[in-house]
A protein has these predicted regions:
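Conserved alpha/beta core of the MobA/IspD/sugar-nucleotide pyrophosphorylase nucleotidyltransferase superfamily
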Residues: 2-5, 185, 206-325
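Conserved beta-strand termini and adjacent loop/short-helix elements that scaffold enzyme active sites
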Residues: 108-110, 166-167, 271-273
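Conserved N-terminal catalytic core of the sugar/cofactor nucleotidyltransferase
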Residues: 1-12, 16-20, 34-134, 141-145, ...
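Residue-level signal for inorganic ion chemistry
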Residues: 43, 123, 138, 181, ...
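Conserved core of the sugar-phosphate nucleotidyltransferase
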Residues: 142-228, 232, 236
Length: 325
């Protein structure tokens, strides 16, 4: 039985929606207090999700702007920094943890921004002929259980030995944000589906006609959760799109390649994941991420008390220009 040893995390986006913060710090390096109470760049939290789910090697697909920042973060402390942290055991433990991560890390550069599918294709030599976990470099996950979101997905792959995507039930009004699948439950499983159609960010009318899933409430669909376990056949499908310049909105899309893999006869599954995803690439999503991590942390009681105090105060005036963000 094949086990998933490798993960690919795409971190090549420019983070334009987080301007002006991303003028000086790349989106993936934005700081968050994790559930252990330690402040880390978001990308470290995402890498730890993979490693603590059983992954052994991680490839980050980066761009020429963020590569140096990421390499610097995962480099050993300089002598001067070691002196600064002398006697601070928690910091030295974190430094040791970062060195352990660095030993498992490979960076691959996407030469130009040509879409999510192209970023994944850039990792083909790292992946080789193995199945791999694919994650987004701007999504943080919480499960609220002792099984991380990535581990839930890996368990399904190991049981069925075929491509599988994490999904969540999502209402019609959010379909424009996510790839969406249609499928039927596998046997008596309450959460695993045999996928028979995949569509990137469908219109509501298309979804109602073509993507309804038996058993889901009306107006709810199975949408991508931001992580997948894929087989090397995805690179054949992506390579075909790149060789034939099959772009959508001027980019090479992963979703179309996933559908091409399925159409060629490979079984494709989806699993409803227990947990939540948070997008740090938008201002409100970033705020949501920090709130979720804080509420799930060792500072939970203090955070809840602070929220109660804040909610007791009338909200500040929000300028008209920012009300839709």
């Amino acid at each position: 039985m094949a086990r998933v040893r490798k993960a690919v995390i795409t971190a090549a986006g420019r983070g334009t929606r987080m301007y002006p913060a991303t003028t000086t710090i790349q989106k993936e390096m934005l700081p968050l207090m994790d559930t252990d109470g330690i402040c880390k760049p978001a990308i470290q939290i995402i890498i730890e999700e993979a490693l603590e789910s059983g992954i052994e090697e991680v490839c980050l697909v980066v761009n020429r702007h963020n590569r140096a920042q990421i390499e610097s973060h995962f480099a050993p402390l300089a002598d001067e920094e070691m002196r600064v942290f002398q006697g601070k055991d928690w910091a030295l433990l974190q430094s040791a943890r970062i060195r352990q991560i660095a030993c498992r890390l490979t960076l691959v550069e996407q030469p130009s921004p040509e879409g999510y599918g192209h970023a994944v294709w850039c990792a083909r030599e790292f992946v080789g002929d193995e199945p791999f976990l694919l994650m987004l470099g701007d999504h943080v996950y919480t499960s609220g259980t002792d099984r991380r979101c990535a581990r839930q997905l890996l368990d399904v792959y190991e049981a069925y030995q075929t491509s599988v995507s994490a999904v969540q039930q999502t209402p019609t009004e959010l379909l424009h944000l996510f790839g969406t699948v249609r499928g039927r439950l596998v046997g008596q499983s309450p959460r695993v589906y045999d996928v028979d159609h995949i569509r990137e960010k469908p219109l509501a009318e298309y979804a109602e006609a073509n993507l309804r899933v038996e058993g889901l409430l009306w107006g709810m669909y199975l949408c991508f959760f931001g992580m997948h376990v894929l087989t090397p056949s995805i690179f054949e499908a992506l390579g075909y799109a790149i060789d034939h310049d099959l772009r959508e909105n001027n980019e090479f899309q992963l979703t179309s390649a996933q559908e091409r893999v399925r159409e060629r006869g490979e079984r494709y599954l989806a699993v409803e994941t227990v947990g939540d995803r948070y997008d740090i690439g938008i201002p409100f999503g970033y705020a949501q991420t920090q709130a979720a991590l804080a509420v799930g942390s060792l500072y939970r009681e203090q955070m809840l008390a602070a929220l109660v105090r804040m909610l007791a105060v009338p909200s500040l005036h929000v300028p008209e220009a920012f009300r839709d963000r």
